[in-house]
Amino acid sequence: MAPPAKRAKRGWVPPGYKYLGPGNSLNQGEPTNPSDAAAKEHDEAYDQYIKSGKNPYLYFSPADQRFIDQTKDAKDWGGKVGHYFFRTKRAFAPKLSTDSEPGTSGVSTAGKRTKPPAHIFINQARAKKKRTSLAAQQRTQTMSDGTDQSDSGNAVQSAARVERAADGPGGSGGGGSGGGGVGVSTGSYDNQTHYKFLGDGWVEITAYSTRMVHLNMPKSENYCRVRVHNTNDTGTASHMAMDDAHEQIWTPWSLVDANAWGVWFQPSDWQYISNNMIHINLHSLDQELFNVVIKTVTEQNTGAEAIKVYNNDLTAAMMVALDSNNILPYTPAIDNQETLGFYPWKPTIPSPYRYYFSCDRNLSVTYKDEAGTITDTMGLASGLNSQFFTIENTQRINLLRTGDEYATGTYYFDTEPIRLTHTWQTNRHLGQPPQITELPSSDTANATLTARGYRSGLTQIQGRNDVTEATRVRPAQVGFCQPHDNFETSRAGPFKVPVVPADITQGLDHDANGSLRYTYDKQHGQSWASQNNKDRYTWDAVNYDSGRWTNNCFIQSVPFTSEPNANQILTNRDNLAGKTDIHFTNAFNSYGPLTAFPHPAPIYPQGQIWDKELDLEHKPRLHTQAPFVCKNNAPGQLLVRLAPNLTDQYDPNSSNLSRIVTYGTFFWKGKLTLKAKMRPNATWNPVFQISATNQGTNDYMSIERWLPTATGNITNVPLLSRPVARNTY
C-alpha cells in the first residue's frame, strides 16, 4: 500500500487565507489576496531571522513594520486584524537588533539603503570640518566688506543633515527622506531580471529598472488651458481625418512613466519569457527616486565672451506627488512613446503632464473637391462638463533637495493572467474531422471522404442536405468580422473606432483585423543613426484563430443553394451603396453570444503593460494594447517638477516671473514583480521559438538589429510574444 501523501503544514490560518497566521509552511501556493501576500513575505523574513540565530517572535522587527505598511489600507478583515496586532506589538515589544532586514531572494528590499562603509563617516567628518571652516570665512568676509555670499548659510545646515542621515537608513514607503547632502545619498543602479522558481512550474519574475532622469524647470509656473485648431487642414474639403482640434490643460508638472515592456526587460529576457512561459500575471510595483541633484545656470560676460557657469543649489527643491487614489486624469505616456525609454545607459527625460479638457467640436463631413461651405467650429467651456484639476490641491507633495530620496511603497496588482501561447484552431479546426473512407495509396495522393449525399452531421441550412466542411456548424464562432475604418463623431469631433487586434490571415487585411501601427523615437527603439524622422512598424497579432480574410467572405441568399448565381450571393466584389471601393465587409459585424476570441498579446518593447479600468457601469472586455487591466485603482501616476527658484526681482503682480535658470537630475529605480507558469512540453515535433539569425542575412531576426554600431547607434524592434502554439478545443 502506498504511503499517504504528505500535506503542507497549515498551522492556524483563518478561512480564506493561506499564510495569515502562525505556524504555516512556506509552500502553500499562491496567496489569496494582498494581505495574504504580505503575510507570506513576512513569514519568509521570519524564516531568515531564525536561520541567522535571531528570535523575531519576542522582538519587533523590520519585517513587522513592513507588514504594517503593506496592510495599512487593507479592506479584508484578516489584513486589518494582522495590521493592528503588529501595531500593538510595536508598542510593547523591544526592537530586534539587526543591521539590515533579511531578504528572501538574495536582493535588498526596495526602498532600503545598505549601511555605508566606515570610510564614508570619516569623509563626512572631514567634509563637515571643511564646510564649517569655509562658512566661517565667508561670514567674516561678508561682515567686513559686504561681499555677496553663495550658499554660505547653507553649509552648516547641510552638514547637520549629513549627521542625521548617517544615523540610519533613509525612509521609504510613500514619502521623502533626508539623504544628507551631496555625496551621501547613494543607491544601486540595477537593471537585472531575477527568476525565482517556486515549484509546480511557477516562477516569480522580478524585473529591476533604473534610469537617470533630467528635469528642466517648466516653461511656465501656471496651469494653461490651451486650444489647438488646425483650420489650414480642416478648412479643406475631405480633410476630416486630419482634424487635431481639441483643448487641453497644460501643467508645470512632468510624468515619470514606466508603463512599457521595454522599460523593464532587455530583449533576451523577453525571448526567455516568451519561449518558456505559458501565462503571466502582474504582482507588485515599487518605485523610488534618489540622488537628487539640482543645479543653477548663470551666464558671465556677453556676446562672444559669454560663458555658462553651473553650480549645485543645495536649497532649491524638487516637488514629488503620487496620485495613489487615481484622482487626476489618467494619461499613459506610452500612447505618445514618452516613457522613461528602453536603454538603461542613456539618460532620459519625463513626459510633460497634460490632460484633455471638455470642448465641443463641429466639423462638416465632405469628400475631395466638394463645393459648399465647411462648418469648422469649436465651442466654449461648458459649465456642465468642465473639470480643472491641479496637483497642488489634490495631492500631498513632497519637497526634495539635493541628496534626498523618495519611495512610493508597494502597489499590488489585481489583474487577470494572460497567455503567452497562440492558438491555430479556427472554426474549421474545431471538433472531429470527417471520416476517411480510403487512405491515400502514396505520399502525394489525397484521402477520400464519404459521398456528400450520404454523410451525417449538423448544419444550419434549410432545404439542402449537403454536409461539407464549409456548411458544418461548430460549437462556437472563433473570431469575428468587425467594421473597420469606421469613423464615428462625438461631441469632441470624429474619431476612428478601435478594432480588436487579430491575425491578418493570408489576405494581409491589416485594417480589417486591427493591426497596430507604432511610430516611435530614439529612446523607444528608433535607429539612433536616423536624422529628423521617426521609425514605424505594423504589429500583427499572433492569434491565428481570430482573423478574417475579408476578400473571401461571402453572404448567400435564402433559400440556400450550393451553386448561387450572381443575384444570390454578396461578395467583396459587390460595392456598398454605389461606392466602388467600399464593400459589405467594411461595415459587417458578426460578433455575437457564440463568439470566442483571444486577449490582445503583450507587445514588446513599445506596448503598454497595464491600464486603468474605465469608471463606467459596463466595462469593456479588454483594451486595445494593454493586456492587463487593473480591477481597482491603477498604480498612481508619479509626478515631478522643480519648485520655483525666484530672484530678488520677483513681483507677484507682474506677468513676467523672474526666475533663476535651474535644472535637476535624479535616479529613478523600479521593481516590477510578475508571476508566471512554465510551459509544459506536449508535442512530438519541436516547436517554433524566438531565435536570432546571423548578421547580414537581411532577416527580420538578424542579430544586428539588437547590436550597437561602432559609434553606438542601436535599435530595438518588436519581438514575438506568443511564438508557441497551443490547443483551444
From Swiss-Prot:
Bias-annotated ranges (Polar residues): 24-35, 97-108, 134-157
> Which GO BP terms, alphabetically?
clathrin-dependent endocytosis of virus by host cell; microtubule-dependent intracellular transport of viral material towards nucleus; symbiont entry into host cell via permeabilization of host membrane; viral penetration into host nucleus; virion attachment to host cell
* GO CC annotation: host cell; host cell nucleus; T=1 icosahedral viral capsid
- Which residue numbers does the motif Nuclear localization signal cover? 4-13
Composition-biased stretches, type Gly residues, lie in: 168-184
One GO MF annotation is: metal ion binding
Q: List the disulfide bonds.
A: none
Q: Where is this region: Disordered?
A: 1-37, 95-185
| Binding-site residues for Mg(2+), renumbered to this chain | 325
What Pfam families does this protein map onto?
Parvo_coat (PF00740), Phospholip_A2_4 (PF08398)
Feature: compositional bias, Basic residues: 1-10
Its transmembrane ranges are none
Q: Which UniProt keywords apply?
A: Capsid protein, Clathrin-mediated endocytosis of virus by host, Cytoplasmic inwards viral transport, Host nucleus, Host-virus interaction, Magnesium, Metal-binding, Microtubular inwards viral transport, T=1 icosahedral capsid protein, Viral attachment to host cell, Viral penetration into host cytoplasm, Viral penetration into host nucleus, Viral penetration via permeabilization of host membrane, Virion, Virus endocytosis by host, Virus entry into host cell
Task: Provide the protein's localization.
Answer: Virion; Host nucleus
UniProt-annotated stretches for the region Phospholipase A2-like: 19-64
Could you name the domain of life of the organism this protein comes from?
Viruses
Family the UniProt entry places it in: Belongs to the parvoviridae capsid protein family.
The entry's free-text remark on domains says: The N-terminus of VP1 is sequestered within the mature capsid. It contains a phospholipase A2-like region and putative nuclear localization signals.
**What's the stated role of this polypeptide?**
Capsid protein self-assembles to form an icosahedral capsid with a T=1 symmetry, about 22 nm in diameter, and consisting of 60 copies of two size variants of the capsid proteins, VP1 and VP2, which differ by the presence of an N-terminal extension in the minor protein VP1. The capsid encapsulates the genomic ssDNA. Capsid proteins are responsible for the attachment to host cell receptors. This attachment induces virion internalization predominantly through clathrin-dependent endocytosis.
The protein here is known as: Capsid protein VP1
State the organism of origin: Parvovirus LuIII
